[in-house]
Regions:
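Loop-helix junctions at membrane interfaces
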Residues: 1-143
Length: 143
């Protein structure tokens, strides 16, 4: 028998986390930063919460919906920025999911988030190198 109450609850939690993520993403856009390519990644909090509270698949869903809705709100849907954000966000969620599942005794959520940030940055720089800017000096931006 299908437990519709549990399914409904999960959908509500995912919706709330996506909404929280989009709000944090919007607030992050308003913060003046010293350089255009550096962000704090505060909307990643929702992905971490989804990972801990709901599971890996739901964390990926929250990430995908955050990138999709955020890109529609800011007019970057299907642009290179959208593609980079999508690939970086998904790679970050995957890495955080792996570290949360296999190494929870060794890393706190902050450490897991740092690995996710590193994965995001690395994937974005590699994609920018192969598809946009073909200069090896770009790799000096890696952390």
């Amino acid at each position: 028998m299908i437990d519709t109450t549990q399914d409904t609850r999960k959908i509500v939690y995912i919706s709330l986390l996506v909404a929280m993520s989009v709000v944090l993403h919007t607030l992050e856009q308003m913060i003046p930063l010293p350089s255009p390519w550096i962000k704090f990644g505060i909307s990643n909090i929702a992905t971490l919460l989804a990972l801990v509270l709901l599971g890996f698949k739901e964390a990926i869903i929250v990430t995908l919906l955050r990138v999709l809705i955020g890109s529609i709100l800011f007019g970057t849907f299907l642009s290179p920025t959208f593609m980079l954000s999508l690939m970086g966000g998904v790679s970050s969620a995957i890495v955080m999911g792996v570290f949360y599942k296999f190494f929870p005794r060794y890393f706190s959520l902050i450490g897991i988030s740092l690995f996710g940030a590193y994965a995001h940055t690395t994937v974005v720089i590699i994609l920018v190198y192969y598809f946009i800017i073909h200069h090896k000096e770009l790799f000096y931006l890696l952390p």
